[in-house]
C-alpha cells in the first residue's frame, strides 16, 4: 500500500527490510551523497538501544530525533551519579549532544502501551567531547566501570583490566578519584583520563 501511495514521488525511496540488518552507513552514503541527513523515527521499543548504538557509531546522520520509551530517554540524557546513568549514557553523550524534548503520554496511542514515551533529539558532535589515546581502551574502561554497579570502581575495573587490585586502586587515585568511588559517578572526562592511565599501565 505504501509503495503505491508514494509511487508518484521522485524524492521518496522506500526500502523494505529489517533495519537492524541494514548497512546504515552504506545506505546513507548512497542516498544522501553530499548531504547531512537527519533521522526521524518512532522506534520499536525492543530495538531502541541497539539501533541507536549502531546509528551513532556509524556517524552517518547529522541529527537523530526519535520517539522512544521515557525510561530510555532519561538514560540517554542522564547525569553522573544518578540511577539512570550508565554505559549507554556515556556512549550517546560521547557521540551526540542529547536533549529530551517532551513526553508523550500513553493515551496518544491506540491501543495505549503500558509505558510513557518521550521524544529525544541527539545532535551528532562535530568533535569528540574528550580526547583519548585509544577508543578501544576508553570503551573497555566504560564497560568495566558499569559492570558491577553496587561495587566500587576498583572492583568493577577488574572485570575488564587484568591488573592487580592494588595497582588498579593506585591508578584510580592517581586520576584524582577517591578509592571508594563507583563507576556511575564518573563523567566522560574522568573516564577518558582513567582509560589513558590504565592503557599506559597495562
What is each PLM-predicted segment?
Residues 118, 122-124, 130-168, 175-178, ...:
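An accessory alpha-helical subdomain
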Residues 1-140, 173, 184, 193, ...:
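Catalytic cores of RNA-modifying enzymes
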Amino acid at each position: 500500500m505504501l509503495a503505491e501511495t508514494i509511487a508518484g514521488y521522485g524524492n521518496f525511496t522506500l526500502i523494505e527490510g529489517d533495519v537492524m540488518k541494514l548497512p546504515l552507513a552504506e545506505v546513507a552514503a548512497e542516498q544522501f551523497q553530499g548531504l547531512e541527513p537527519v533521522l526521524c523515527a518512532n522506534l520499536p521499543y525492543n530495538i531502541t538501544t541497539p539501533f541507536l548504538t549502531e546509528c551513532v557509531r556509524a556517524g552517518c546522520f547529522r541529527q537523530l530525533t526519535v520517539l522512544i520509551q521515557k525510561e530510555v530517554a532519561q538514560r540517554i540524557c542522564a547525569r553522573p551519579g544518578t540511577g539512570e546513568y550508565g554505559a549507554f549514557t556515556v556512549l550517546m553523550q560521547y557521540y551526540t549532544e542529547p536533549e529530551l524534548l517532551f513526553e508523550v503520554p500513553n493515551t496518544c496511542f491506540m491501543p495505549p502501551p503500558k509505558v510513557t514515551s518521550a521524544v529525544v533529539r541527539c545532535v551528532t558532535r562535530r568533535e569528540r567531547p574528550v580526547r583519548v589515546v585509544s577508543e578501544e581502551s576508553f570503551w573497555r574502561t566504560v564497560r568495566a566501570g558499569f559492570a558491577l554497579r553496587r561495587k566500587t570502581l576498583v572492583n568493577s575495573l577488574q572485570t575488564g583490566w587484568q591488573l592487580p587490585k592494588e595497582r588498579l586502586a593506585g591508578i584510580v587515585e592517581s586520576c584524582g578519584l577517591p578509592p571508594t568511588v563507583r563507576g556511575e559517578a564518573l563523567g566522560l572526562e574522568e573516564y577518558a583520563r582513567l582509560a589513558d592511565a590504565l592503557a599506559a599501565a597495562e
